[in-house]
């Protein structure tokens, strides 16, 4: 059963990586994997040590960081990048970002801009 579980997780991970900009929900993930939310959560915990939702959040944060590290001078803002990746509460985005990367998103952007 581990190999089916592994294949299911791989399928869902690939989907998340390909469609992260569309902010996939747990319903989307269960639909493409054809397993229940509970089964998917168990498989993710076993294979990756996190839930599908946590994995989606991690991917979205990584994509936001990539944008902050390669800004368009004068046009890239932390709030625009955050909302692009589905983070609509600036304080929550800053907290999640700091927890994952050890710095504020504004620090990442300032460093990338050389300011």
Language-model features: locations:
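Short alpha-helical elements of helix-turn-helix
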Residues: 6-10, 58-62, 66, 90
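A general, composition-driven signal for non-globular sequence regions
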Residues: 32-35, 54, 59, 86, ...
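DNA-binding recognition helix and immediately preceding turn/loop
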Residues: 2-51, 73-84
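Sequence-specific DNA-binding recognition helix
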Residues: 38, 44, 71-109
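C-terminal intrinsically disordered extensions
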Residues: 7-9, 112-115
């Amino acid at each position: 059963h581990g190999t089916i579980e592994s294949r299911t997780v791989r399928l869902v991970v690939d989907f998340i990586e390909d469609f992260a900009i569309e902010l996939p929900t747990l319903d989307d993930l269960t639909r493409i994997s054809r397993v229940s939310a509970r089964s998917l959560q168990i498989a993710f915990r076993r294979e990756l040590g996190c839930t599908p939702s946590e994995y989606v959040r991690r991917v979205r944060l990584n994509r936001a960081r990539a944008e902050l590290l390669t800004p368009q001078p004068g046009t890239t803002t932390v709030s625009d990048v955050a909302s692009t990746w589905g983070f609509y509460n600036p304080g929550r985005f800053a907290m999640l970002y700091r927890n994952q990367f050890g710095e504020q998103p504004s620090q990442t952007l300032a460093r990338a801009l050389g300011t």
